[in-house]
A protein has these predicted regions:
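Extreme N-terminal leader/targeting segments of oxidoreductases
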Residues: 1-23, 148-169
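Nucleotide donor/acceptor-binding cores
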Residues: 21, 44, 138-139, 179-182
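Glycine-rich active-site loop/strand segments that organize a redox cofactor
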Residues: 57-96
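Feature captures the FAD/FMN-dependent oxidoreductase FAD-binding
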Residues: 91-148
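Short glycine-/acidic-enriched loop or helix-start segments at secondary-structure transitions
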Residues: 35, 58, 121, 151-153, ...
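N-terminal Rossmann-like FAD-binding beta1-loop-alpha1 element of flavoenzymes
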Residues: 20-48, 192-198
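Residues in the short beta-alpha loop(s) of Rossmann-like NAD(P)-binding domains
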Residues: 52
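Glycine-rich dinucleotide-binding loop and its adjacent helix/turn
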Residues: 85, 91-94, 144-198
């Protein structure tokens, strides 16, 4: 199999034209870190390619007042319980800090920022391409989430609507909606939390 002979860190790895390992995880959020934890436990060589400049995944782009809707102990990643927070439901800042500490605690080999262009099958291996850089692995795990490609449904007469239509992925705070009539579409956690705020 392929093995990384030394720990990969930022610029050093980015300067390498090609890196080979057993598994490449694309994405650096909670799913990627959880996967990395179990790969490390099984001593399976891997690297994480994350397009963000720092740890935190989609939480880096969430609205300012976002909180977890469950207590920290229920929202922990494998191997390390999220430390107690000031309030029962951790804030965006507290979750990002936890994800940063989690990465550091387990010394995951993360290269960032790397925007993956495409993945191609090359017989027994997969090649992962980011610009002129290429990595090869036996397996590739997509942990990119949905934040970067939010879905906004179309509806009849949409082109005539004069108001603002905004996906929760682009919501920051309630200021834009002050003294306006607002309709929230969707009953998920994002919709419920934003509704309570606007």
């Amino acid at each position: 199999g392929f093995y990384i002979k030394e720990k990969i860190k930022g610029d050093k790895a980015l300067n390498q034209k090609q890196t080979e390992t057993d598994v490449i995880i694309i994405g650096g959020g909670q799913a990627a870190l959880s996967t990395a934890y179990f790969l490390k436990r099984k001593k399976i060589p891997f690297i994480i390619l994350d397009d963000q400049n720092q740890a935190g995944g989609a939480w880096l782009h969430a609205w300012n007042s976002l909180r977890l809707f469950s207590p920290n102990s229920w929202s922990s990643l494998p191997g390390w319980v999220m430390p107690n927070t000031e309030q029962t439901y951790p804030t965006k800042k507290e979750v990002i800090e936890y994800l940063q500490q989690y990465e550091q605690r387990y010394h995951f080999p993360i290269i960032r920022p790397v925007y993956v262009d495409h993945v191609k099958s090359e017989g027994e291996v997969l090649s992962v391409h980011a610009g002129e850089q290429t990595w090869r692995a036996k397996a590739v795990i997509s942990a990119t989430g949905t934040w970067s490609h939010p879905y906004i449904p179309s509806y009849p007469g949409q082109e005539n609507f004069k108001g603002l239509q905004l996906h929760s992925a682009h919501y920051q705070n309630a200021e834009l909606f002050k003294d306006k009539h607002v309709m929230i579409v969707g009953g998920g956690n994002s919709g419920a939390q934003i509704l309570a705020e606007v």
